[in-house]
């Protein structure tokens, strides 16, 4: 690998790593204050779980030579312990292995949307290993493993047989995580109270900003080096993020009366999800359109979720699953032959076979991810209890599972502290939810005003 290409992949790796604290802050801000630390733990522990299993056998499952030549799953022993990529052979294989660790880990972190505030942490760790092995790894092999006839290497069927176009993981990462998060949410059931509003919008702002920065590495690094393709997909990603932000604010204004900051952050991420499978296959104007489309579809899906009381806490199915579908279908219809991928959508004279190949890949991805995740969670629940007790849920999962609290609010509603096993216990008068404190103070102020 050319040194300049390796330098860009290393830089992209660093950018993608920002998505983990970013997702922690985004998700932590979206729940009540008594769930923040558990949310952080679920996201960050994904990196720990996946790093271990990926080094042992995961890289072989994802990018190993397909067992039997069927394109279903790679050989888990081919890269066992990374033993055969420990020397510099000029291919950059070790760096790519690290890059794919981040892809797998962020996918698992997204699935935590279906478990937020109610899943035992130990059960989450076990679930993460099983989910990577039986859900993520096969899907990633189908999409990321590319045939090499000269060496006899056989990759995944979806990429090589179906010839499905997915630039950077719209299927293996986003649709997969969306369907899996929905399945996990259904198995676990709803929280006792779903009426908790985002407790900290500044956390959401910081988290969304880090995720956007990480996405430039996510898509840009997939280009494989410091080249025109990398610059192209970074720019289309930026444009799609803008389209998502504007699209979500518009539909929010039309249907809800006012555009919100939270909505603009959601739309931005939906736009980035939508461009992920399409970043190299659309024009700059097409990138804006696909971002806006992803946001509109996500808005509709979030509204549907609320109407059906599905407790997908961070809307992973609406934002990642549905926007990912929108991006893939956009390529099918509006792929621009002048873009680097050279894929012509149906409206640009492309093959009519796109009309069944792209939807087939989407349907298989959603069905497999949802079905196997539901099966894993259901069976696991027979052997170990997945959900915390009602008492622990009311107390707050941070205290129940981690013996810590993100906030300690005194009688004036200010102050921060934390309790660990190594420090003093926080007094019982602690109020865990900063939003509720604000509501109570406002009620007091209104009462005083009315009495004057």
From Swiss-Prot:
InterPro entries: Ammonium/urea_transptr, Ammonium_transpt, Ammonium_transpt_CS, NH4_transpt_AmtB-like_dom
An example Gene Ontology CC term for this record: plasma membrane
Pfam families: Ammonium_transp
Keywords: Ammonia transport, Cell membrane, Membrane, Stress response, Transmembrane, Transmembrane helix, Transport
Cited Gene3D superfamilies: Ammonium transporter AmtB like domains (1.10.3430.10)
Subcellular location: Cell membrane
PANTHER family: AMMONIUM TRANSPORTER MEP2
Protein known as: Ammonium transporter
Organism of provenance: Corynebacterium glutamicum (strain ATCC 13032 / DSM 20300 / JCM 1318 / BCRC 11384 / CCUG 27702 / LMG 3730 / NBRC 12168 / NCIMB 10025 / NRRL B-2784 / 534)
Name of the encoding gene: amt
């Amino acid at each position: 690998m050319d040194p300049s290409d390796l330098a860009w992949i290393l830089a992209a790796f660093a950018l993608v790593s920002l998505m983990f604290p970013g997702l922690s802050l985004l998700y932590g801000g979206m729940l009540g204050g008594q769930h923040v630390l558990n949310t952080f733990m679920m996201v960050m522990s994904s990196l720990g779980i996946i790093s271990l299993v990926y080094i042992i056998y995961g890289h072989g499952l994802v990018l190993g030579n397909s067992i039997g030549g069927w394109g279903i799953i790679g050989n888990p022993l081919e890269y066992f312990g990374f033993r055969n990529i420990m020397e510099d052979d000029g291919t950059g294989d070790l760096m790519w292995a690290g890059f794919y660790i981040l892809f797998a880990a962020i996918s698992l972190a997204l699935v935590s949307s279906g478990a937020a505030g109610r899943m035992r942490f130990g059960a989450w760790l076990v679930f993460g290993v099983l989910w990577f092995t039986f859900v993520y790894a096969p899907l990633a092999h189908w999409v990321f493993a590319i045939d090499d006839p000269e060496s006899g290497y056989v990759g995944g069927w979806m990429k090589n047989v179906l010839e499905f176009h997915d630039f950077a993981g719209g299927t293996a990462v986003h649709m997969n995580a969306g369907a899996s998060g929905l399945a996990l949410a259904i198995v676990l059931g709803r929280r006792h109270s779903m009426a908790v509003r985002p407790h900290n919008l500044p956390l959401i702002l910081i988290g969304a900003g880090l995720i956007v920065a990480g996405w430039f590495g996510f898509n840009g690094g997939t280009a494989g080096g410091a080249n025109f393709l990398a610059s192209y997909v970074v720019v289309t990603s930026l444009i799609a993020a803008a389209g998502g932000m504007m699209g979500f604010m518009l539909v929010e204004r039309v249907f809800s009366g006012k555009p919100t900051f939270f909505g603009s952050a959601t739309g931005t991420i939906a736009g980035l999800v939508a461009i992920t499978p399409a970043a190299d296959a659309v024009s700059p104007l097409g990138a804006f359109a696909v971002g806006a489309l992803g946001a509109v579809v996500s808005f509709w899906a979030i509204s549907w979720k609320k109407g059906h009381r599905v407790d997908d806490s961070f809307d992973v199915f609406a934002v990642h699953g549905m926007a990912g579908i929108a991006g893939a279908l956009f390529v099918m219809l509006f792929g621009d032959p002048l873009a680097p991928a050279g894929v012509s959508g149906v409206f640009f004279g492309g093959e009519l076979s796109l009309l069944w190949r792209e939807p087939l890949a989407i349907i298989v991805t959603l069905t497999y991810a949802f079905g196997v995740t539901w099966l894993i969670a259901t069976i696991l629940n027979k052997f170990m209890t997945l959900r915390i007790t009602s008492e622990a849920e009311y107390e707050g999962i941070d205290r129940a599972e981690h013996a810590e609290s993100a906030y300690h609010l005194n009688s004036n509603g200010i102050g921060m502290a934390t309790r660990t096993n190594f420090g003093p216990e926080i007094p019982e008068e602690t109020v865990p939810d900063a939003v509720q404190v604000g509501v109570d103070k406002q009620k007091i102020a209104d009462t005083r005003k009315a009495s004057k």
